[in-house]
Amino acid sequence: MHRRHFIGSAALATLLPLVGGAAAIAAPRGRLLPAALAPGDTVALVSPSSATDERLSLQLTQEAMQALGFKVKTGEHYASRYGHLAGTDAGRAGDLNAMFADRQVKAVICVRGGSGAARLLPMLDYDAIRANPKVLLGYSDITALHCAIHARTGLVTFHGPIGAGSWNRFNVDQFRRVFFDRELMQYHNTVDAGDELVPRKNRTLTITGGKARGELIGGNLAVLTALAGSPYLPDFKGKILFLEDVSEAPYRIDRMLTTLKLMGALDAIAGFIFGECTDCDPGDGYGSLTLDQIFDDHIKPLGIPAYRGAMIGHVREQFIVPVGGRVELDADAGRFRLLEPVFGQA
């Protein structure tokens, strides 16, 4: 994602050979489940990352939450701007802290991603988050929040549509099934041949066959990798790692997976799911590795169940995935399923 100006991955890999988090930060004991959601609850809209360019997008976000049956509360700075960011770091972090501390708010919905969420991680009140476990929803740059909050509190958070994104029929159905019906979800792609002889859209590819069980961690590859050497990555041991990205040339994907390899993360995981890498074609000029070759180099030698093509990432229709949820991955079938509930009491 070209607007993210991070330290180079090769330099990050030399900081700390961590599997997850710095030794000085104690890992939480067990998972922390968010309170269940219901129509009529109050949800908060916050902007932890980039500013939203158009007022209409903010209006549509509020209308979408109301159409889902919620009362809406907005962060003080959710419509602010500071450079490309939605306000200052202190203002954006303050909104997150206030909404987690507010007992009337049952979920925190991120308006958009972009960049800047990682700047907030030292300013978050993890004790307040731990004391008020609630739904956090977003993706892309919100990966920084998913990683840090899960690492520091054990809270299960949700990688899925942003408030200003598309609330199409598929995404609304996912939302209701995950949050209102609290299904033990079966995540398998919707495949439609359309006018093609054989289906092309939403196809999955097995990298290494087999089944594995573990807790899901992951999100956007660039954002997650940029946290290397910090105390804000969860432990990778025995986990099912899911990743996605957008507008990254294959050589960048290769470099970031190399970082995860060098820091010990890839050798620790039990399974691997890659979603969509939207607009990740090689550029002009020198030759390029293909994504197939990159996954064959980095993932296949691990010998763990792995597949690519899941409906996760910068796509119009996307899964709502619980970060910290316990799942079973079936790489041959290109699907995974929840094994346990991911909500506590309402």
Language model region names:
Residues 252-346:
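C-terminal active-site/capping subdomain that shapes the small-molecule cofactor and substrate pocket
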Residues 1-17:
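N-terminal secretory signal peptides and thylakoid transit peptides that target proteins
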Residues 76-132:
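N-terminal small/polar loop signature for handling phosphorylated ligands or for N-terminal nucleophile
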Residues 126-148, 156-163:
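Short, acidic/small-residue loops that bind anionic groups at enzyme active sites
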Residues 20-52, 56:
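C-terminal segment of N-terminal export signals and the immediately downstream linker at the start
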